[in-house]
Amino acid sequence: MNRTLLKKAALCCGLLIASPFIAFGQIHEGGHRPDWNAIDTISFLSFNDFHGAFVKDRNVPGAAELVQAVLDEKAKNKNTVVVSVGDNFSGSYFSRITRGNPLPEMFREMDVKMSAIGNHEFDWGLPYLVDTAAVCMDYIAANIVAKDDHAPLEWLEPCKMVVQPLKNGGSVKIAFVGLTTTDTAVKTRSENIRGIDFVNPVDAARVQVATGLKKEGKVDMVVLLMHIGTDMSNPDVIEEENAKRLPWIEGVDAIISGHSHKVVLAEVNHLPIIQAGVNGTHLGKLNFEVKQDAGKYTIQYIGGDTIRVAGKGNSVIDSLVNKEMDKYGFEEVLTMAENDLIHDRNINKKDYTTVGAYVTASYADTFRKYSQISKKYGKQSVVGVNHYGGLRASILKGEVTCLLYTSDAADEED
């Protein structure tokens, strides 16, 4: 495995070498030499586990507000790099019916540089991910390889570099290394991940850094973009056992995480780790001071923030969402709810809830209807079952529309 990963890393590093950056000390166009004593700030802005939450709801800001929040933050610092940490499109009824639209336009509006691959990226099958999603955005994952021989995948790069210009005329080269939870192998339909394997994230990340991203001066910073869960209540912050050593890899400057839907801002081994909730409720922001002295960069973490997304929506994205709403009749009223029916992963995830009862009853009723079990066997008991993590939304008081189906996150292709 290590030999294969080294091969892939070498390929990635070769791409980095070919990138259009300017070597230290060179005179720039017009005879301008960088001011090596200047101080600048680079910000990493991230969101994760959007899950196709395009439509604004009581606890969900919607795509338009998320995009506008990103643009507002970028206006504060032009040296801002925007990234996604995976689980982008699957998880809402709206997104399933629209096939992920308008996610491509949304990413372009925010200038999202790349995305980690989340476990739910495979919900609609590998052909969709390879032929549609990966065409619209740059996915990266260093620990996803071919199952038979652990060879690199043609459609997937382990890392990507961003060359960020600075105000003095210089530039900082930042390598993002993608990682995906190895739980994907057991939590995803086998046919949706046929032919690929998920290897140890620490080994994969260490290979990427050790092959020279930092040591040979190819990049100035290395950021792990990982769809692996983190939680402030966990003593190690990183939840998965095979990923806990990631903060101790020499040469890594920051970890931007997703998967566990938590709001996280922490430091482990003096390394900043951030996660920005779920459904676009928050943005994660990490700030680094870049000081240039005698032709060398000194880069230091100076703080971060988890920003609640709220406020006006972006008119371009709002128009696109409304267009899809009208096209598919998502606002058709099915019934009325007299009270809020709450099923919240952070409140009563493992409790009996009315939402859970309705969803599982619908499974049983549908089975009775289409199997014609009563005609074949007479009166029979049918039990509908869903695991407690499978329900993702409440049913709120008032008009209940077709978007009700977002409550059931069983969003894989049939």
Predicted features and spans:
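Charged, often glycine-rich, active-site loop that binds/positions anionic groups
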Residues: 96-98, 397-402
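A short C-terminal boundary segment appended to hydrolase-like catalytic domains
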Residues: 38-39, 171, 185-186, 290-400
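Acidic, metal/ion-coordinating pockets
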Residues: 26-309, 355-362, 366, 374
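Bacterial N-terminal signal peptides
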Residues: 12-20
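Glycine- and acidic
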Residues: 52-53, 190-192, 341-349, 407
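Conserved small/polar residues in nucleotide/adenosyl-binding loops
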Residues: 405-412
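Bacterial N-terminal signal peptides that target proteins for export
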Residues: 2-10
